[in-house]
A protein has these predicted regions:
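Core beta-strand elements of the Rossmann-like FAD/NAD(P) dinucleotide-binding domain
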Residues: 3-5, 187-196
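Flavin (FAD/FMN) cofactor-binding core of flavoprotein oxidoreductases
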Residues: 121-125, 146, 219, 286-364, ...
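Flavin (FAD/FMN) cofactor-binding and adjacent substrate-gating region
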Residues: 75, 95-169, 175-181
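Active-site substrate-recognition segment that forms the wall
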Residues: 20-25, 81-85, 191, 196, ...
């Protein structure tokens, strides 16, 4: 039966492409279905770069995952003989008692991670072009940096295909059903069957998994690129760091100048609700752009305003802004990644590996209980789920 597989994956973005690779590496017959073209710009994983860091202010329980993620990214680089991770270091700036500083220091202390306190007197010399506000302190995480987001996905796709995975693009899933030990996936043109399923549908998770009543909402987020006032300002070749600021106006982050697009910067906080991910407004949000401009004037004075390029991506948020990595309540042969809440791509390697383990083995090599869906009071957890889900 040519449409029978060991594992089917819904979604082939960052996490889905990694899952396809790690499933194929295990020798499984794997099919991945993606609603758009390969390495597209209509979801959450595009825009040149993504931050990767280990002293995780969000929660120290992420650190074991991050250590494995780093190892897997390095293995992928070795396999393809290409650099994907740029260890620029990360300068983090915020109030002494703020969420950022307290969280970073806690994770670094608990997991013995390198984290340098930057004295005010040395900040300007060490990080030219950056401003340390009077009410803030700074730390530097030397083993942090950024990933080339599209290149990571492109190479996971390519390596999965080289190992025999069947990856199909422009194939939105229209429905799925479970009959005894078999899962049937329906697209516009075909039906596919497998005993195991991974769902990594990004902003479409609530559509694909509507039976679970996941507590998710999607936000529209903006990425901006700016020219710089001098050719050497904030340049990757000049060892400029990746950066993250906590300010009274929210969280802002950015990257060294990587290419002709200029310096990329974005506001991590905020965002506007998306009702339909297929119809997201991709125009510039003028009010949000003004906030980014104000941040740059105050903290990166060698950036030339206005911005010259812009892109929109989506965050799929949970109520507590932590991931959902779990098995389906009724069908444990279905593994789910959802609600990565705007900080998930750095984990794509390890989440892909873990989802395959969860679907095939029923357990993961790294503890993920703190990301269980059971922490939420979901309708499906209270009353059970239907055995069929048809999508419009």
């Amino acid at each position: 039966m040519h449409n029978l597989f060991d594992l089917i994956i819904i979604g082939c973005g960052g996490v889905g492409s990694a899952a396809a690779y790690y499933a194929a590496e295990r020798g499984l017959r794997v099919l991945a279905l993606e609603r758009f073209e390969a390495v597209h710009a209509r979801g959450s994983s595009h825009g040149d770069t993504r931050v990767i860091r280990q002293a995780y202010f969000e929660h120290p329980d992420y650190v074991p995952l991050l250590k494995r993620a780093y190892a897997l990214w390095e293995q992928l680089e070795q396999r393809i003989s290409r650099q994907l991770f740029y260890p620029t270091g990360l300068v983090e700036v915020g109030p002494e008692s703020g969420v950022l500083m307290q969280g970073v220091r806690q994770s670094a202390a608990m997991h013995q991670l390198p984290l340098a306190e930057i004295a005010r007197g040395e900040f300007k010399d060490r990080f030219p072009g950056f401003v340390l506000p009077e009410d803030c302190v700074a730390v530097f995480e030397s083993n942090a940096g950024f990933l080339l987001v599209e290149e990571c996905i492109r190479h996971y796709i390519g390596e999965a295909q080289r190992l025999g995975a069947d990856l199909r693009f422009n194939q939105p899933v229209r429905g799925w059903s479970v009959q005894r030990d078999e899962i049937c996936i329906t697209t516009d043109s075909e039906k596919f069957y497998a005993p195991r399923l991974v769902v990594a549908a990004g902003a479409w998770a609530n559509e694909v998994l509507a039976d679970l009543g996941l507590p998710l909402h999607v936000l529209r987020k903006h990425l901006h690129w700016y020219p710089v006032k001098t050719p050497t300002a904030y340049g990757l070749q000049n060892h400029s760091p990746t950066f993250f600021y906590e300010t009274s106006a929210g969280y802002f982050y950015g990257f060294p100048v990587l290419n002709e697009r200029g310096l990329k910067v974005a506001q991590h906080s905020g965002g506007t609700t998306v009702q339909d991910p297929l119809k997201v407004d991709r125009s510039v949000d003028v009010a949000e752009l003004e906030q980014v401009d104000r941040f740059l004037r105050a903290h990166l004075p060698d950036v030339a305003i206005p911005a010259t390029d812009h892109a929109v991506c989506m965050y799929t948020m949970t109520p507590d802004e932590h991931f959902i990595i779990d098995q389906h309540f009724v069908h444990p042969q279905i593994a789910i990644a959802a609600g990565l809440s705007g900080h998930g791509f750095k984990f794509a390697s390890v989440l892909g590996e873990s989802l395959v383990q969860l679907a095939i083995d029923g357990k993961t090599s790294i503890p993920l209980e703190f990301l269980s869906l059971r922490r939420f009071d979901c309708p499906s957890y209270r009353s059970g789920c239907t055995l069929r889900r048809d999508l419009g």
